[in-house]
Swiss-Prot record:
Its cofactor is Zn(2+). L-methionine binds at residues 451-453, 504, 619. This is 5-methyltetrahydropteroyltriglutamate--homocysteine methyltransferase. The lineage of its organism: Bacteria, Pseudomonadati, Pseudomonadota, Alphaproteobacteria, Hyphomicrobiales. L-homocysteine binds at residues 451-453, 504, 619. The active site is at 714 (proton donor). Zn(2+) binds at residues 661, 663, 685, 746.
């Protein structure tokens, strides 16, 4: 029974506390190192006590394991001032957060991190780890790149575990995946061409681990589940042959996860390694092909426990699949494991004392998943009778969940069956709608607006916390929120914004706010998962059929619109984003769960329109994040994702204007899907890329209206008027004046008022100059 990695944050987010104390200067480096050592020791002890027999080391990180790899191999850009020798913690955190004033460089309202460019050295770019909600720091390579061993972390942590009595299997990110995750600063440099210079550092690390007594090493090459060309497969083969030649006695467990090997199976099986790990949660169908083709002396690690979702496994059903493989290959040739590292799930469901008892009995967090592994291992080694009670409990939980009325709602199933294609189409084409909307609103050219949220100040957070604790009454809390909203609306009018928002002070999180008001969702108290560094998220649990018992935003919209004669946007989170940022039920297709959410949001859109809303924004911040890893699967996903957006947005009159917002750095390759969403206005993040995102529109004639962001909200810097007009002139080269709206990149929730005020004043001034 092996684990590939465990959550780093601690059951009570102890890592977050220690990091933020260190960053703010309240504690020193030794206190941070001591806290980290305590978390590692607790992790190893927990795994041992739960019956895990193959325990990893070097799976802990202060910020991100890809950044740890960059530091290990000395891939540190010159801007951070490091030349050689061990990399100081200050340099490490400068790469992670930017130097001098990294605290200012917040995530946006949708949790996407800034790039620290405000002042000092910028942070490295950050992006999603494959198709998960974890983020990694993107390695940067230049021509003439040199690598050198500059961190002994992997060796130190192996030694640390050994001193505590644990024989561990150290984890390294594989050299080929590491290079593929990186970015070259030189357009002509293929990162894979750097492999001959990189491998000697890996060999040095592996030799040091072997000298310390490591018999096994886990090397992660998740790139093997991607679309690879023959050249990459060749590079993989060359890399592992070189490692095997240098260390013939070291046993390597090559791990793949987040998908099936597919057409890379032969390439993976040809590598000179001792073991191969496959993901059987994401790609259960690959078991037969791998088992049939794998050489008999290859140890197979079968990732049967889902490392990315929180549902309890049906252990007897898993044993039905595992037993034939074990009897065919022999128990010593099979390991069982989670599908991937457990960093993607919370730590311990037993901490959830407020959760519905029936729902709780269906869940397994990291601790429970290790317990499931131990049960499977025992059953395979000694027979099912040895763990009969645990197997019965598992089967009973699966049966109870399947039959529970909490999961199934006949009304929702009836509505889904009644959905027609007309429900996902606006009444008229955009050209006709646009004419009606222009007549209705009479907006000037280059209309100005914001994305939705305004700064959530310390006072707002304090009031929310007091209300949650019961020390601030419902009446007083509502009065406070009304005052904040009214003040924000007055200020928007004063500076001359054309289309207003209410500021979203009543909302804690753009997904949680809606999930808490929809049936079929539940929320944990301690279900934290690392997003990056000290930032943790608590995804909602989507456990059953979704419906909307009552209006969710109409009351606040009506109050806000009553304070102004200008258009006030209704603000909603879209179904695809709610789905992609939740732990999703695994008993129905994701597309069906999304369609249910879309119908609930459609009801809200309809109620907002009936209440008088003339503009309704439906944010799809995470539409792109749901793209499958293999391009051949993109179309299926985009078809249902776009259909779900249209289903929630298309029940309105032609004169009602539907807005959507997307924040990410790349959509040229899905421009057709974005156009087919048919939103009247789409706002996007473009300021940091200097409008490069709009290159897609040079050849693609996008018909609808678009708000390219002119103010980078990830940075505290206030952009000047001429900077914004410069960006708008670039936009004008690709779009007609009539199409362009003017707005920031994203919501303003994480910024300070003293930054937002001058920036938006400048934005309005830029609009006037463009007119």
């Amino acid at each position: 029974m092996a684990t590939l990695g465990t959550p780093r944050i601690g059951p009570r987010r102890e890592l977050k506390t220690a990091l933020e104390s260190y960053w703010s200067g309240k504690s020193d480096e030794s206190a941070l190192l001591e806290a980290a050592a305590g978390l590692r020791a607790a992790n190893w002890a927990r795994q041992k006590s739960l019956g895990v027999t193959v325990i990893p080391s070097n799976d802990f990180t202060f910020y991100d394991h890809v950044l740890d790899t960059s530091v290990m191999v000395g891939a540190i850009p010159d801007i951070y001032g490091w030349k050689s020798g061990p990399v100081p913690l200050a340099t490490y955190f400068a790469m992670a957060r930017g130097a001098q004033g990294g605290n200012d460089d917040a995530a946006c309202a949708h949790g996407h991190q800034g790039d620290g460019h405000a002042h000092g050295a910028p942070a490295q770019e950050m992006t999603k780890w494959f198709d998960t909600n974890y983020h990694y720091m993107v390695p940067e390579f230049t021509s003439g790149q040199r690598f050198q061993l500059s961190s002994l972390k992997a060796i130190d942590e192996y030694r640390e575990a050994k001193a505590l009595g644990y024989q561990t299997r150290p984890v390294l990110l594989g050299p080929v995946t590491y290079l593929k995750l990186g970015k070259s600063k030189d357009a002509n440099l293929d990162p894979l061409s750097l492999l001959p210079d990189l491998l000697p550092v890996y060999i040095d690390v592996l030799k040091r681990l072997a000298a310390e007594g490591a018999e096994w090493v886990q090397i992660d090459e998740p790139c093997l589940v991607l679309d690879l060309d023959d050249a990459t497969r060749k590079v993989l083969r060359a890399a592992y042959e070189q490692l095997a030649d240098a260390l013939p006695k070291l046993k390597v467990m090559l791990t793949t996860y987040f998908g099936g090997l597919g057409d890379n199976l032969d390439a993976a099986l040809s590598l000179p390694v001792t073991g191969l790990h496959i993901d059987l949660a994401r790609a259960p169908d690959q078991l037969e092909a791998v088992a049939a083709k794998a050489p008999h002396d290859l140890i197979l690690s079968l990732g049967v426990i889902d490392g990315r979702n929180i549902w309890r496994a049906n252990l007897p059903a898993l044993l039905d699949r595992l037993e034939p493989v074990v009897s065919e290959r022999g128990a010593d040739r099979v390991q069982i494991a989670p599908s991937c590292s457990l960093l993607h799930v919370p730590i311990d469901v037993s901490l959830e004392t407020d959760l519905d008892a029936e729902l709780k009995s269906w869940l397994a967090f990291s601790v429970q998943k290790m317990g499931e592994l131990a049960t499977l291992g025992e059953a395979l080694a000694k027979g099912r009778a040895s763990v009969a009670d645990a197997l019965k409990a598992s089967a009973d939980a699966a049966a109870a969940r399947k039959a529970s009325p909490k999961v199934h709602d006949a009304k929702v199933e009836g509505r889904i069956a009644a959905v027609t294609s007309d429900m996902a189409r606006r009444k008229s084409a955009f050209a006709e709608r646009a004419k009606l909307q222009r007549e209705r609103f009479g907006l000037p050219p280059f209309p100005t607006t914001t994305i939705g949220s305004f700064p959530q100040t310390a006072e707002v957070r304090k009031a929310r916390s007091a209300h949650a604790k019961g020390t601030l009454s419902d009446t007083d809390y509502e009065k406070f929120l009304q005052e904040e909203t009214a003040r924000t609306i007055r200020w928007q009018e004063d500076i001359g914004l054309d289309v207003l928002v209410h500021g979203e002070f009543e909302r804690n999180d753009m997904v949680q706010y809606f999930g808490e008001q929809l049936s079929g969702f539940a929320f944990t108290r301690h279900g934290w998962v690392q997003s990056y560094g000290s930032r943790c998220v608590r995804p909602p649990v989507l456990f059953g059929d979704v419906s909307r018992p009552r209006p969710m935003t109409v009351g606040w919209w009506k109050y806000a619109q009553s304070l102004t004669a200008k258009p006030m946007k209704g603000m909603l989170t879209g179904p695809v984003t709610i789905l992609n940022w939740s732990f999703v039920r695994d008993d129905v297709p994701r597309s069906l769960a999304c369609r249910q959410i879309a119908l609930a949001i459609r009801d809200e859109v309809s109620d907002l329109e009936q209440a008088g809303a003339t503009m309704i924004q439906i944010d799809e911040a995470a539409l792109r994040e749901g793209l499958p890893l293999r391009r051949s699967e993109w179309k299926t996903y985009l078809d249902w994702a776009v259909e779900c957006f249209r289903l929630c947005a298309s029940g309105v009159a032609d004169a009602t204007q539907i807005h959507t917002h997307m924040c990410y750095s790349e959509f040229n390759d899905i421009i057709d899907a974005i156009a087919s969403m048919d939103a009247d206005v789409i706002s996007i993040e473009t300021s940091r890329s200097k409008m490069e995102l709009l290159d897609a529109f040079k050849t693609y004639k996008y018909p609808n209206e678009i708000g390219p962001g002119v103010y980078d909200i990830h940075s505290p810097r206030v952009p000047a008027v001429d900077e914004m007009t410069g960006l708008l002139k670039l936009a004008r080269e690709r779009l007609s004046d009539r199409q362009i709206w003017i707005n920031p990149d994203c919501g303003l929730k994480t910024r300070k008022w003293e930054e937002v005020r001058p920036a938006l004043v400048n934005m309005v001034e830029a609009a006037k100059l463009m007119r």
